[in-house]
């Protein structure tokens, strides 16, 4: 499965890239993005089957990005990473069709 990793913190992106054995789980990381704008460009070039995405990012949130995906009929499954425990984030993620919701900090094994 094709995976896109989106997080505004480059250390999180690099950690996810290098500390998780994606191939063993059947994933190929096709791209990474540090914001929603770059993620959109990546998705327009090549739609990922799964997107691992931070919710709180500058300019546009991960929730905005998922809404953009759904408006275009894209079926990418979204797993949100967030440090925010507020129920409204989880509720909105589910309303938009989010696949899962992981609280940070999370061990790489949990991801």
Q: Over which residues does each language-model region extend?
A:
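A generic structural motif
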Residues: 23-29
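CheY-like receiver
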Residues: 40-41, 46-111
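Conserved Asp/Asn-Gly motif in the active-site loop of CheY-like receiver
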Residues: 30-37
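Hydrophobic/aromatic residues located in beta-strands of well-ordered beta-sheets
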Residues: 29-30, 78
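Conserved acidic segment of CheY-like receiver
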Residues: 1-12, 16-17, 51
């Amino acid at each position: 499965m094709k995976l896109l990793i989106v997080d505004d913190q480059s250390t999180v992106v690099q950690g996810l890239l290098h500390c998780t054995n994606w191939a063993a789980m059947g994933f190929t990381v096709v791209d990474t993005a540090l914001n929603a704008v770059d993620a959109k460009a990546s998705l327009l070039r090549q739609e990922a089957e799964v997107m691992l995405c931070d919710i709180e990012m500058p300019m546009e949130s991960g929730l905005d990005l998922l809404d953009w995906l759904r408006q275009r009929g894209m079926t990418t499954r979204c797993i949100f990473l967030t440090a925010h425990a507020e129920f409204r984030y989880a509720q909105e993620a589910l309303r938009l069709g989010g696949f899962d919701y992981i609280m940070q900090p999370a061990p790489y094994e949990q991801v």
